Amino acid sequence: MNQSNCIVAQSGGPTVAINASLAGVIAGVKSSEKYDICYGAVNGILGILNENYLNLSDIFADDANLEKLKTTPAMYLGSCRHKLPDYKDDDSPYVYIFHQFDKLSIKAFFYIGGNDSMDTVLKLSDYAKKINSDVKIIGIPKTIDNDLCMTDHTPGFGSAAKYIASSMLEIAHDTFIYAVKSVTIVEIMGRDAGWLTAASALARNEYNTAPQFIYLPEVDFDKDKFVADIKEALAHTNNVIVAVSEGIHDADGSYITSSKAACDQFGHQQLSGAGKALEFIVNENIGVKVRSVEVNVLQRCASHLASLTDIEESFAQGKKGVTIAAEGVTASMVCLKRISNDPYQVEYTYSAIKDIANEAKSVPRDWINDAGNDVKPELIEYLKPLIQGETAVAYKNGLPDYMDVSHLHKCN
């Protein structure tokens, strides 16, 4: 009987939950009668082009390692931001990739990633159809930005939202201690979609109203209105905390940043400095104590504060990818459909990759207040279930005990 194997890779920016999705793929292969060996390509699609593989079936033969993988941050297989050309312009990488699939007896390829990774899934799917390949191409979602279409929310977002809300509450406690007027601006990831920044509203409780203002890229930023907002708030409280997306822009579409940003291979500006830019505005126009805080990579790698709901759903979506591939599905991405909020229930399904790749899901305008400086209760209700539950992270010598990833930082 001919061997039937599969290969999985991770791509794009890391999250707390992407390794849980990888664990789900490995577990799905373990329990599948369809596939024999699960290979892992190191550093995304480049791992296939460079023939850099790991035998994940061997590495994770012990279920204890699989459990540890689920709570290990970032990407066990490493990542890349490599954009495949259109095969009509240059099919050489496609020829090579599918040659490697044949060489390894690959019958399914799973790509765990966000928008740009789904572009790769679409291109490989189209090429597979062109050459009548029987390799199933499946996308497994991942992004803290929560901007993938056709799915209720994305793996990694819930944990990042939990970290953002927790950090916002802790920052609020830090500011409460001084009886002086102050403004704290917290810059949160989100180039085109403000889901993560919106999650800062979850920090509000019976004694904390921070953040008092939330500015998202879905609404044009107005400097004069921002200054007026802050002045009005300072008339009623000593401490004002602002949550701002890194991708806020003015009515002309120009980003509000403190410096000119470079672009990655997919043409996305690598933004930073929105918080610092707002700090300058407050300093020049209001003159109170002001500081900006850039949460940066911490929001996407804090496994010690992961959402159990997020980890469990991410694992299940990895397994679902294996299931649908074994059933003959291809050119698709695993999706979540929300059934209800209370009790919180979801259904695992899938959608055609052509309806997902190169599209983006923004925060609905009717979930943002009319003033454009806060979110509505509907968004809070959407977010709440996603941050529930805590994971049991193993500790060693007082620190989290994660999977060894020394294979990722060896010199080439």
What is the meaning of each model-derived region?
Residues M1-L54:
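N-terminal phosphate-binding or glycine-rich loops at protein starts, especially the Walker A/P-loop
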Residues N2-V8, L69-K83, K142-D152, A179-S182, ...:
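Gly-rich Lys/Arg/Thr-decorated short loops/hinges at beta-loop-alpha junctions or inter-strand turns
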Residues S11-G13, A41-L46, R81-H82, G114-N115, ...:
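Short, ordered loop/turn segments at secondary-structure junctions
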Residues T15-V25, I48-L49, P93-V95, N115-K123, ...:
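Short glycine/serine/threonine-rich phosphate/pyrophosphate-binding segments
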Residues Y255-N412:
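C-terminal non-catalytic interaction/assembly regions of soluble proteins
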